[in-house]
Amino acid sequence: MMFNTVTQRLFLLVSVMPSMLLANSLHEQYVQLLDDPEQQLSCFEPDSYYQYCLKNIPHQGLFVIDKQGNKVYQPYYFDNWPDEAKDGVYRIRQGNKIGFADEKTGNIVIEAKYDCAYPFENGKANVGTGCQLETDGEHSWWVGGDWVSIDTHGHVITSSEKP
């Protein structure tokens, strides 16, 4: 099986290692791990700029944790893979709410307060409250709710119909 995309590499990484250092970009870390799968990366280096670590918690899933070991958020999963970063951010989940985090630092940049959220594209994302996820077993989609478009800082650009 060939692992070409960043999310496929993240899946491989999570399967192979329970935690990892966020000292390089995630992409650089995935490449490093693919080059040497036996390499052991420590979670938090003393001089690291980064404040978070990915950790696979058995029977709970993949979490981003802080230096104290607190669960901060979970990456949002789409099509059975962690969400890919777009426009410098990726979707996150805190409880049942969706927000966005910076792809390089892991810092939350838009609070997890939405029930539904599409990835950013060209600097904006459609997000909704009061919407619900429906599925046919293979595909899923959101229905209902109030939707708005936001910029990468979380500011409302326009009200919108469901995308």
Describe the residue ranges of each PLM region.
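Position-driven detector of the extreme protein N-terminus
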Residues: M2-F3, P18-L21
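Bacterial N-terminal signal peptides
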Residues: F11-S19
